[in-house]
A protein has these predicted regions:
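Active-site-proximal segment of RNA-dependent polymerases
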Residues: 3-7, 90-152
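Conserved polymerase palm-domain catalytic core
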Residues: 51, 120-221, 225-244, 260
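Conserved phosphate/pyrophosphate-binding and hydrolysis machinery centered on Walker-type P-loop NTPases
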Residues: 34, 38, 108, 112, ...
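Non-catalytic, polymerase-adjacent accessory regions of viral genome-replication enzymes
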Residues: 1-46
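Glycine-/proline-rich flexible loop or hinge segments
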Residues: 23-35, 65-76, 103-105
Length: 349
């Protein structure tokens, strides 16, 4: 068996497809289509394997619709069967090849990484910077305007072609071309597109670390931060990075991309990181997040009181937010929120 055949087997044989089904059902087993597939999981997986081996597999037409909250965006929804196949393709062929060579501080959508790891990494960067320069220093915070809606298909496919073997690239290209019309724009809900998202800027990551020599650099998808002692040098970096992005068809969000003093604090992944005069890093939850949560809790509790939603679901929602808030220095805030949440239920048996 050659390498290409081995890669294909790792994607289309029964066991990886079955494992993908178990992964895909999480959080959506309540849907009728998912429950039906899962209840007949062995039979459906054998059928899918047979179609993939014989070359008779054809993806079903995706359903496209718009959502408006928290912001308007297009959604592409695919059948559960197609999701199972794509999950196996992503996990067993695309991701292992694409992630080779990533810098350590590319933090999104990867095994062993994520938001918690990214926050801890930024905190460590600030502490290291403090040991050399105190609180003197500057931040270049970058944000790309409409990262996924403006991602050119040829740019993403070129990156896939550069790093994937021939069989995997052919399958990847087929999936993306069948799901997305036109030359520009992807739906970030797709795992395959998320892999494109962490990969397309890989060359830029290496450029910032190895050519611009920025030691304290971190990227979470299209949100990235550079820390340096020189404001002038960071402004130079901004110009050079902007030119690199333009080559790929991207542009900065000019309102969110700026150079500023480290003393102002860095807002990243839902928290503001404040470096104190003693070198301690404090994480403060964004006030907007707290305000939104209070409104949401009020709405959910009213629904529960009317019998439209079980209290356990509302408790689960609040505890999820609370666990997130607890990642910062939020002891007093959590006490206030616990009291607010308890007061919302007053009058209930």
């Amino acid at each position: 068996m050659n390498d290409a055949e081995e890669i294909a087997e790792n994607v289309i044989e029964f066991e990886p497809l079955l494992n993908s089904m178990y992964k895909c059902k999480k959080g959506v087993i309540w849907k009728d289509s998912v429950a039906h597939y899962y209840l007949n999981g062995i039979e459906e997986t054998l059928k899918l394997e047979k179609q993939l081996r014989e070359g008779t597999y054809k993806a079903r037409k995706p359903v496209c619709f718009k959502v408006t909250h928290p912001k308007e965006r297009d959604i592409v929804s695919i059948s559960f069967r197609d999701r199972v196949y794509q999950r196996s393709l992503n996990d067993n062929a695309i991701y292992p090849q694409m992630s080779k060579g990533f810098i350590y501080d590319n933090m999104a959508c990867q095994k062993g990484k994520g938001t918690d790891k990214a926050r801890n990494r930024l905190k460590a960067f600030l502490q290291k910077h403090y040991r050399k320069h105190g609180t003197d220093g500057y931040v270049l915070q970058c944000d790309i305007s409409g990262y996924y809606p403006n991602m050119k298909h040829e740019v993403a496919l070129e990156k896939f072609k550069k790093k994937l073997d021939g069989w995997t690239y052919e399958k990847t290209e087929t999936v993306l071309n069948e799901q997305y019309d036109g030359d520009t724009g992807y739906n970030p809900g797709s795992q395959m597109v998320q892999i494109a998202g962490i990969s397309v800027l890989d060359e830029l990551d290496h450029y910032i670390k190895e050519v611009l020599r920025i030691k304290y650099y971190i990227r979470y998808m299209d949100d990235f931060i550079l820390i340096h002692e020189s404001e002038e040098y960071l402004n130079t970096c901004r110009e050079k990075i902007e030119a690199k992005l333009q080559d790929k068809g991207f542009a900065f969000n000019q309102k969110k991309t700026k150079v500023y003093s480290l003393r102002k604090g860095i807002t990243f992944l839902g928290f503001t990181f404040k470096l104190t005069d003693t070198g301690k890093v404090i994480l403060i939850l964004k006030p907007k997040n707290v305000k939104q949560e209070r409104k949401k809790l009020y709405r959910l509790v009213q629904q529960a009181k009317r019998g439209e939603k079980p209290k356990a679901k509302v408790d689960e929602c609040y505890n999820g937010w609370r666990n997130h808030a607890a990642k910062g220095n939020s002891t007093k805030l959590l006490r206030r929120m616990d009291k607010y949440y308890k007061d919302l239920w007053k009058g209930e048996a």
